[in-house]
Amino acid sequence: MSYTSAKSRPSYQFDSLLEFKDAGLIASSGPAEVDSAEKIVDVGRGAFDGDMVIDVSAIEIGTGDEGYHIQVQGSDSATFASGVERLASLTLGDSIVTGGSADNAAGRRVLPFNNRGLDGKVYRYLRIYVEVERTIATGINFTAFASQRS
């Protein structure tokens, strides 16, 4: 095991205006919530480069086929009624779903993203959307916030 000094470890400043999901279990597909309401963050008209900090406190992998696709989505609609684009995605779950050599466990994940689509369009409104697949009993519990890169 090697030691990484505090100078070289990234730190992420929490800003409640950039909170995308608070603690709460997700057992079916849908948008993330803060205070029991769907959370949409307006990052303005310009480019936004950041890291989505995802702290997983619990993840169900009991039946061996669970999958959780955590997406950063952008839209030009403040309600996400139209123009929805997946900007970044993280897949967690059983190794059968993720294609990894081991099942995922609780812990911090950092997902780099920006608010530009593949066509170069800048999306002002952002949210987290979770797609849940296969046999789910309890689901996944995590919090998520964005940290803007300077």
Placement of each model-derived feature along the sequence:
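Surface-exposed, low-hydrophobicity beta-strand/loop segments enriched in small/polar/acidic residues
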Residues: 1-150
